[in-house]
Amino acid sequence: KLTINAACKMCRLCVKKGPEGAVEYVEDTVRPSVDKEEWKGIAVYVDHVDGKIHPVTLELLGKARELAQVTGHPVYALFMGNDIGEKCHELLHYGADKVFVYDEPELARFKIESYTAVFEDFIQNVKPSSILVGATTVGRQLAPRVAARMKTGLTADCTILEMNEDTDLSQIRPAFGGNIMAHIKTPDHRPQMATVRYKIMNAPERSEEESGEIVNCSIAKERLGSHVDVLDIVLKEKEKFIENADVLVVAGRGVKKQEDLEMLQKLADLLGGQLACTRPMAESGWLPAKCQIGLSGRTVRPKLIITCGVSGAVQFTAGMNHSENIFAINKDEKAPIFKTAHYCLVGDLYEVIPQLIQKIEEKKGA
């Protein structure tokens, strides 16, 4: 008996090893094609809350400007919301050639149906070659739906973006647990879409003068309908996020007991920082998932990060390798983290951390 289900990897082994004629692999004889000349420009989705623009948008505008230099394409920003007429001018200080604004009362709050409809309208009218979306809570919902609507590809959590002269975008991200870097392209479809996490790219400096133009867009009201009604909004108490910390102390597998985290927390408090962790620590429940650094956690870029008993797997270092100063403590002198760190200390964290705490306390008491 031969069974093929959704887990099929298209390896064709069943064709070669199975009974003759039982399984046939049929390939598309006509490869899809796209007229790339019709699609021009690199667009950035403007992620915001009540007009306050998320900094990942500015980072993506800087990257879009860099990519556009290869092809000579313009840089677009897609801004949708309500009462955002004044706020959209800020984007002209960060390299956007055109800001396409959809200012409608129905767009005051994020609703997936209406936001997708606006995104689709923008793509159909402007035809951007590439679209960059921040990997935020909203971006992670919106980008896949738009890609499916346009029948195009989407690469999530890219760490590197490179543009070819033929306007094909190389979307690069770690794969297979960080063991390889996958180079993904969408050569036969447009637009090309990618999401990028906050603090992966560098934000450009704000220019003194505006350069570019605002394009006010309209869309039929019936397209903004939604099956979701926002009845009330309850503001959460403001939290501290490791992405915003200037100093981080990171707990790795070298920490033997959950109680020992108090020692690292004390070090973090003395330095005015926060405690973070690697994936195994979060999965064991020792620290909440919001404290996890890496591809499956948060991306950080603090002024100082101290790793304690962290081996330094690629999936972890991809989330922190842009930190200004990386100080690594590990008793294994061959630990991969030492290839990433700026300062390396081979030693037992249970000996090093107490001494470090003592020195800092003495310095503060002096």
Identify the residue ranges that each predicted region occupies.
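N-terminal glycine-rich FAD/FM-binding segment characteristic of electron-transfer flavoproteins
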Residues: 1-366
